[in-house]
């Protein structure tokens, strides 16, 4: 694969309709199969869901980080669905036993976060080891996923990919690096006004912070500290990005509408633009 082909594929995806991102991505992979692995790991697409039959058909979120072949690992039962053959399972990625305990704690904790902040939706957390040694509370990575749908086909997907590594400056300090992508789709129809408004796109930001943890404490306490630190970071990131979407991007969208409207209907268009912006913000706040 050449860098030029990969860059061209990413540039093309940025210019195409974001509502057909998955279809466009599949078409590019079909045209250039050698780009498949890099595109799948680099392009964030709206999250899909599966049901865990081993845990009362509880829903979980699917992404490239819990995928093996065409199956996705559930964070609830640690099982792949659709089920893999015994031979395939031998090579399938699973977190180590200690890291799996942290994964369970993280899923339970972020499920509470989801209920409080999203008032619905689905959350999933997946972790993986960064080295082959037994996990003892040090270096690991993972992803925290949230999805909230509305009955009007609007949806919010947030993907937080993170790494937790020992800080080079102190053995009791950890470096948390989080890359967050928000995928937003707002679809509003007013039947009384015979109008339809749709807004789609994604926004990515990165943050990094060093936080001290007392490594002399029991492993369960260290796990709780990691989850609390990640929760605090993700809460701050999501709040900042929501505000950024409302106060910057939607304002810019309204300005573009204003600049392109017909001068002959300036007054009515301005009112329509204000209504459209208010409708977009209400749609975002409901997710």
Swiss-Prot record:
Q: Which cysteine residues pair off into disulfide bonds?
A: none
Instruction: Just give the chief location class.
Output: cytoplasm
* GO CC annotation: actin cortical patch; actin cytoskeleton; cellular bud neck contractile ring; cellular bud tip; F-actin capping protein complex; incipient cellular bud site; mating projection tip; plasma membrane
- Phosphoserine: residues carrying this PTM: 85, 92
Keyword Phosphoprotein included in the entry's annotation: yes
**What is the stated purpose of this protein?**
F-actin-capping proteins bind in a Ca(2+)-independent manner to the fast growing ends of actin filaments (barbed end) thereby blocking the exchange of subunits at these ends. Unlike other capping proteins (such as gelsolin and severin), these proteins do not sever actin filaments.
Protein family (similarity comment): Belongs to the F-actin-capping protein beta subunit family.
* Listed name of the protein: F-actin-capping protein subunit beta
Q: Which organism is it from?
A: Saccharomyces cerevisiae (strain ATCC 204508 / S288c) (Baker's yeast)
């Amino acid at each position: 694969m050449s860098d030029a082909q990969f860059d061209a594929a990413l540039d093309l995806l940025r210019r195409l309709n974001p509502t057909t991102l998955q279809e466009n991505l599949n078409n590019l992979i079909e045209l250039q199969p050698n780009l498949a692995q890099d595109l799948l790991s680099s392009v964030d697409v709206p999250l899909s869901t599966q049901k865990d039959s081993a845990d009362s058909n509880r829903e979980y979120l699917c992404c490239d980080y819990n995928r093996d072949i065409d199956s996705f690992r559930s964070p609830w039962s640690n099982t792949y669905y659709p089920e893999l053959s015994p031979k395939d399972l031998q090579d399938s990625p699973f977190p180590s036993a200690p890291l799996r305990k942290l994964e369970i704690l993280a899923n339970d904790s972020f499920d509470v976060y989801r209920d409080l902040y999203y008032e619905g939706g689905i959350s999933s957390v997946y972790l993986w080891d960064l080295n082959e040694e037994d996990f003892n509370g040090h270096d690991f990575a993972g992803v925290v996923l949230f999805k909230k749908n509305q009955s009007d086909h609007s949806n919010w997907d947030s993907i937080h990919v993170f790494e937790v590594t020992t800080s080079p400056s102190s053995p009791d300090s950890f470096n948390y690096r989080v890359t967050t992508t928000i995928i937003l789709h707002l679809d509003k129809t007013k039947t009384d006004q015979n109008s339809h408004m749709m807004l789609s796109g994604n926004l990515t930001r990165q943050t990094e912070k060093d936080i001290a943890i007392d490594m002399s404490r029991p492993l369960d306490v260290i796990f709780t500290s990691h989850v609390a630190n990640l929760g605090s970071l993700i809460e701050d990131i999501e709040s900042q990005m929501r505000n950024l979407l409302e106060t910057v991007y939607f304002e810019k969208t309204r300005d573009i509408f204003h600049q392109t409207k017909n001068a002959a209907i300036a007054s009515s268009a301005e009112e329509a633009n204000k209504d459209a912006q208010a409708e977009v913000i209400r749609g975002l706040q409901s997710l």
